[in-house]
Swiss-Prot record:
Stated role: Putative TATA-binding protein.
Family membership: Belongs to the asfivirus B263R family.
Originating species: African swine fever virus (strain Badajoz 1971 Vero-adapted) (Ba71V)
Note on domains (UniProt): Possibly contains a TATA-binding domain.
Induction comment: Expressed in the early phase of the viral replicative cycle.
Name the UniProt record assigns to this protein: Putative TATA-binding protein pB263R
Keywords, alphabetical: Early protein
Length: 263
């Protein structure tokens, strides 16, 4: 019978690259006020379910669970984070809870600059991120704000991708120590800042310097799942994906192994 690692690569060696979560962003007209001033001006209404800020909180009836409350300090030895107001939210921001297709999104708005962040975006075309920002602008246009609010730009802030090896047998796994050793000795598309060897055979982690000051992390797991984390463009993820796919194709005999058949 043929070795199962060879059977692993009779068709596609790895699955296709997929985005699994993104922090989407945008910029709107500067509101020319601070978050402290804006939270006092806003009046909660659809489509916003809740508003949270270090200096005020509001919600529609039935959405009380979305109101943030101060957390108790668990580690007394750790130096406390510098906060403002009640410390429940990101400094300088107002957080709005907005629904899109049965998923609640937590938009962050920095009113003095007009910057917007929407974590947890899951649609590959960013439809959900754009919709949430548009709903926020529609909400602001019905508030007692003198300035006309417009969307200036949309942008991706951080995108996470995933793929995995495509084995026939679930007993085919990645030899993590050998994978880490390969990363140290073969040419890479971007300089590698650091490689963290597997701890207790859980994963290998490496950081690629895709541009000055910008790191993208990869996590390679024992059973073949591979994450590419912290990209700001799909292009950089695709370059790293192609590199890893080729590495697996060329060196599969070194980095793949087959677990014994259970008794």
């Amino acid at each position: 019978m043929e070795d199962e690692t060879e059977l692993c690569f009779r068709s596609n060696k790895v699955t296709r690259l997929e985005m699994f979560v993104c922090t989407y962003g945008g910029k709107i007209t500067s509101l020319a006020c601070s978050h402290m001033e804006l939270i006092k001006m806003l009046q909660i209404a659809e489509p916003v379910k809740a508003l949270n800020c270090n200096f005020g909180h509001q919600c529609l009836p039935g959405y009380e669970s979305l109101i943030k409350t101060p957390k108790k300090t668990k580690n007394m030895l750790r130096r406390p984070r510098k906060t403002e107001g009640d410390g429940t939210c990101f400094n300088s921001a107002i957080e709005a809870s907005i629904l899109f297709k049965d998923k609640m999104y937590k938009l962050k708005c920095f009113p003095s600059t007009g910057e917007i962040q929407v974590p947890g975006v899951i649609f590959p075309d960013f439809e959900d991120g754009k919709n949430i920002i548009q709903q926020w602008v529609d909400f602001l246009q019905h508030q007692p704000i003198e300035k006309k609010i417009q969307i200036i730009e949309f942008k991706t802030i951080m995108i996470n991708f995933k793929f995995q090896i495509n084995p026939v047998s679930p007993r085919v796994i990645i030899h993590l120590k050998k994978f880490a050793a390969l990363l140290e000795h073969i040419p890479t598309p971007y300089p590698i800042r650091e490689i963290k060897p597997p701890l207790e055979d859980s994963k290998v982690s490496a950081k690629f310097m895709v541009s000055p000051g910008k790191k993208v992390r990869i996590n390679v797991f024992l059973k073949g799942k591979i994450n590419i984390l912290g990209c700001n463009t799909k292009e950089s993820a695709e370059i790293i994906y192609t590199f890893l796919k080729d590495l697996i194709s060329v060196h599969w005999q070194e980095i793949l192994c087959v677990l014994p058949v259970p008794d």
